[in-house]
Amino acid sequence: MTSPITVVTGANSGIGRATAIHLAVNGHRVFGTVRAVAKAEKLLATAAEQGVEIELAELDVADDASVERGFADILERAGRVDHLVNNAGVGGNGVVEECSSEQFLDVMNIG
């Protein structure tokens, strides 16, 4: 049986990084999307510490052309995508519990 192929957007930090690592540890082939592959050292180091590999794909969810290029790259390498974790967002200031509804929507509404 082949491993499920999962794409995690915004995998370079926070919840995205933790999700990508968790899925890889649990047998998924994970493609972590990041805006700049050159800045993904922490993601790759954390994966290596856990004994797993995260494959990177450069993708900015706020740029349609970047999304098309990123998914074309993933599909070329993997042939399919079984799961998508749509995690990417812009950073907010403070903790979620203290954000207004408007601030929360600003974090989630990219582009």
Language model features: what each stretch is:
Residues 5-8, 84-85:
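Conserved hydrophobic beta-strands of the Rossmann-like cofactor-binding core
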Residues 12-13:
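Conserved glycine-rich cofactor-binding loop
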Residues 52-53, 73-86, 92:
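A glycine-rich helix->loop->beta "capping" turn
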Residues 108-111:
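Short alpha-helix in the Rossmann-fold core of NAD(P)-dependent oxidoreductases
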